[in-house]
Amino acid sequence: MKTEMGKNIEALMKKWADYCHRKWPKSIFVKDGAFPCYEDQQTKILFIGRELYGKKNDGDGLVINYWNERAGMDNLGVFQSRLLYLAYGISKGQCTEAHWKKMQCATELDCRFATEEFSYAFMNASKLLNVDGTQIGDVFYDFINDKTNQDFFIREIELLNPDIIVSGNLGDIGFMAKLEESGKVKQSAKHLNNQNRFNYLFEGKIPWIDTWHFSAHKAHFEGFYQPVCEAAAIFLGKEQGTTD
């Protein structure tokens, strides 16, 4: 049974898809939203990804599977694995190397994912895939620069109502600047540890960390897990946990 939030997200997706089909008739609208048990989490985590410029990529299966009946994902890749690691670390307040070394592999975490133990929500910066498999660069930038899409995007975040947002390199494509124009997103003064990545606030209260693209060629621990989980722990005021 869908929750009130789920029903509202579904209604938003329908309106959004109708708009996109009129403006980009050759593209496929891909829904996203929350995995099961997202609303049950003590810390509600929203990831926002940026797809690659082709029809097929490591993240496509992820967004499509949000609307499957089952929990979990098939054919885990770098993109999906990193989200699992980050979600687990952020939700548990665990960001040290000792925690990392004790952590289970992504496929084992996936078996525990989308349960009361840990879950998250996911959004794509663009909701469009090309039917013919050609490059989507132009459509992608048309999408994120469209004011109506930006309004839909902000509304989806409001409905998901996360405690923290982690996005994959939206600043470098100018999307964060576009969202700042809405007045809903503001850049904070702090950088994300030693990475040249900026922190933001949504509606003046929800921490938003914009890090590397989730498929970037970076070390899992030093490039993603440690800096993002440390920043999240500071923002959320979480003590570093000791449980597995």
Predicted regions and their residues:
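Short mixed-charge
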Residues: 88-116, 185-203
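Short, contiguous, well-structured surface segments enriched in hydrophobic/aromatic residues
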Residues: 113-126, 130
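A Trp-anchored, charged/polar loop motif used as the substrate-binding/catalytic surface
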Residues: 21-36, 94-108, 143-156
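Short, solvent-exposed loop/turn segments at secondary-structure junctions
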Residues: 51-55, 126-130, 170-174, 213-217
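C-terminal capping/extension of enzyme domains
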Residues: 1-15, 137-154, 172-244
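Surface-exposed cleft-lining segments at the edges of enzyme active sites
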Residues: 63-73, 89-93, 127-145
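Proline-aspartate-enriched helix->loop->beta-strand connector
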Residues: 153-171
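Active-site and ligand/interface coordination hotspots across diverse enzymes
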Residues: 1-92, 156, 196-200, 237-244
